[in-house]
Amino acid sequence: LEPFYEIRWPDGSYFQASGDDEKMQSEVQRLNPADLPGYKRFLKDSQKRYIIGYEGMVAEPMHRLWETLKVLPTFAMLRADRSIYGLAARRVKDERLRMALSFHPLFIGGDPMHVTSIYALVAHLEKTYGVHYAMGGVQQIADAMAAVVRAQGGQIHQNAVADEILIKNGAAQAVVLTDGQRFDAPLIVSNADAGHTYDHLLRKHSRRRWTTGKLARKRWSMGLFVWYFGTRGTAGRWADVGHHTIANGPRYKGLLRDIFLKGRLSDDMSLYIHRPSVTDPSVAPAGGDTFYVLSPVPHLGWKNKVDWQKEMPIYRAKVAAEVEKLMPGFEACISTETIFTPETFEDRYLSPHGAGFSIEPRILQSAWFRPHNVSEEARGLYLVGAGTHPGAGLPGVISSAEVLSKLVPDAPVAQSKTRMAAE
């Protein structure tokens, strides 16, 4: 995509992220010319963190403590104890640029005020590889994976809810569904949230490390209010609203504090607007558009959690008022809609506390400190997905599968089927 995304502020200012160095420098200078030298230093910071944090760790197994210990000297040198916002604040003075350089961990469930500055690697990652979109939507990625499974002789059971993983003599033995069906297997891979895997699927098994108490003490990522809607006759309207738009509210640090530290649903908000149909018309009927608008909100683990059955229509109206500023008249064009709240994530995706991105990626909840891809609780049990290493977000989740491919023994596959999968 080009530009990658646009960030907007209430005062009408904006920042367009791009893969073009000159354009990026121009954007920085437009907001605050004095911050250009600091921005260039931040890019160097980002590259150093990319080398150790991405190339050295993301796709590598971290279930052995030594794998994390050996990078600690480099982490110390790079001041991984500082937050990504803290690093950005040391480099640039303009609060808008500080936000633009530090917000990325929000998209993997982390508070930029507290997650490690190692996540500054995203700037170099974007600069090197760009920002991409799978034509046809994320479903196309899932369908392609399913095609490989089936080509290798695998079966996929849909609308089948796992209720328990059976353990015998310290080894994973079988998966039992809620309808009583049982699937025996010498190896089991769980892509349920790690918290759900241990606290529910292994609830009858005595756990050594990932006990209910330990999981309860973890910091979980924020929840999400996600409003999906389609519109009629809007192709070509709101031309300044591209594929990815971030619309900031009046507060950055204060809003993050409410969400992550106080568990309070604020009246103000910052929104991410996704409009894939400007890139890929196939995802909407002719002449129409497909959108979703995402607002970070507290998860359900707080003492005074939000009652979303009551709050949803109220909050929808508040979100609509903000979207109206970007896309005047949009509500009259809506043809279909659905809304996900943290309760949806808890009920539909079995996510603890309705968290959108599983365990928050703080430094002591990352790498070896995160639930391991190789479970300690039972031989032959493996974990994949947002709750394990390397973490949440589409790149992280797919990378966790790459990590697992280095750990799970290969299953025998007929040569003809292997060839089909490769093709």
Predicted ranges, named:
Residues 10-114:
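Rossmann-like flavin
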Residues 94-108, 266-274, 325-390:
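A glycine-rich dinucleotide-binding beta-alpha-beta segment and adjacent secondary-structure elements
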Residues 1-4:
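N-terminal FAD cofactor-binding segment of flavoenzymes
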Residues 232-347:
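C-terminal segments that line or cap access tunnels to active or ligand-binding sites in enzymes
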Residues 161-167, 340-342, 409-423:
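Active-site-proximal substrate-binding core of FAD-dependent oxidoreductases
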Residues 386-409:
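A conserved FAD-binding loop/helix module that cradles the flavin
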Residues 121-179:
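Helical element adjacent to the flavin cofactor pocket in flavoenzyme catalytic cores
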Residues 163-285:
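Mid-domain catalytic core of redox enzymes
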